[in-house]
């Protein structure tokens, strides 16, 4: 049977009370963007669900485009029929015939919110179940663990039937929680942090520090490609590429070796915070994981964070490396991240960096250099690009220009 719509269930959005409307509106905008090259599609949002009216569009194409959209708990290809029992029976039989396998099992799960329909939910289950059993010989009922679950939703505007539920990306719609700057290196952790921030509704803009000739064009391109992977979940990621060579060279010359990494991170954070201010961001996201490296001890974080009062979101802070790697593999950033190109966090790394730097000493070391002027110069030369979905993202080839 040909499906005429996709039924979208909100999940967590249902708990948002008075703010629900703005979350649903944002989700509808994100869905519309994902379907932008399907002009026949229409989106209809309601308080507890959303419909995508296909108007002849390929439902499988719509499925693929819904899968990475945060804010969707689950969705189902569905059909709508009139409030007529014979039409419901015909649609139910057609759906189960298409979905069942030989010697399979099924159940009917009906819900009636339109009280004028002549049968209640239990009666619908019995009537439709009996009709299906009479017409499909090798099918039996299993109410606990069926192979096919036929859902029937009787509403004032019609009866909606579906046989399959696909899990969505869950979370909150990207953009519903505001904007933040993601400190995107070429490593494993920061893309995962960006993904998790997006899942909580944050619109991210990536900030990447580029230090030629110490870092290569391949390292820069790797970061752009990683941003492309993250764009899969939002449609597009703005990326700010910061020239960082001069600052790193001055740090190497003027700052004691043991705290080079601490001062470097402080300068990165200052620049990121200024970009956040210019771009009306509300927070900074990074991939710090507690205790993983010298700059990620609590003492180091305290010394680094002292340059800003802006909230720092660390989605992976309590994760083991293996947990982070699992997510990186899931979102298809791992193979990119392990490409052997140095980024600015790995150059000039001292053999024995301090794990417990003292803030007063750090500030004393910095006081002999006019870092303000260097930061201003770097900001004046930032390159900003719009990054779309990565061409090699793990989605079907025909969907590569999805957003």
From Swiss-Prot:
EC number(s) given by UniProt: 2.8.1.4
Chain positions recorded as ATP binding sites: 183-184, 208-209, 265, 287, 296
Keywords of the record: ATP-binding, Cytoplasm, Nucleotide-binding, RNA-binding, Thiamine biosynthesis, Transferase, tRNA-binding
Occurrences of domain THUMP (ranges): 60-165
GO biological processes: thiamine biosynthetic process; thiamine diphosphate biosynthetic process; thiazole biosynthetic process; tRNA 4-thiouridine biosynthesis
Catalysed reaction, written as an equation: [ThiI sulfur-carrier protein]-S-sulfanyl-L-cysteine + a uridine in tRNA + 2 reduced [2Fe-2S]-[ferredoxin] + ATP + H(+) = [ThiI sulfur-carrier protein]-L-cysteine + a 4-thiouridine in tRNA + 2 oxidized [2Fe-2S]-[ferredoxin] + AMP + diphosphate; [ThiS sulfur-carrier protein]-C-terminal Gly-Gly-AMP + S-sulfanyl-L-cysteinyl-[cysteine desulfurase] + AH2 = [ThiS sulfur-carrier protein]-C-terminal-Gly-aminoethanethioate + L-cysteinyl-[cysteine desulfurase] + A + AMP + 2 H(+)
SUPFAM superfamilies in the record: Adenine nucleotide alpha hydrolases-like, THUMP domain-like
Localization (cell): Cytoplasm
GO molecular-function terms, A-Z: ATP binding; CCA tRNA nucleotidyltransferase activity; tRNA binding; tRNA-uracil-4 sulfurtransferase activity
InterPro entries the UniProt entry points to: Rossmann-like_a/b/a_fold, ThiI_AANH, ThiI_fer, ThiI_N, THUMP_dom, THUMP_ThiI, tRNA_STrfase, tRNA_sulfurtransferase_ThiI
Biological pathway: Cofactor biosynthesis; thiamine diphosphate biosynthesis
GO cellular component, one term: cytosol
Keyword Hydrolase (UniProt): no
Gene3D superfamilies, per the entry: 3.30.2130.30, HUPs
Job description of the protein: Catalyzes the ATP-dependent transfer of a sulfur to tRNA to produce 4-thiouridine in position 8 of tRNAs, which functions as a near-UV photosensor. Also catalyzes the transfer of sulfur to the sulfur carrier protein ThiS, forming ThiS-thiocarboxylate. This is a step in the synthesis of thiazole, in the thiamine biosynthesis pathway. The sulfur is donated as persulfide by IscS.
Similarity field: Belongs to the ThiI family.
HAMAP family referenced in this protein's UniProt entry, alphabetically: ThiI (MF_00021)
Protein name (record): Probable tRNA sulfurtransferase
Highest classification ranks of the organism: Bacteria, Bacillati, Bacillota, Bacilli, Bacillales
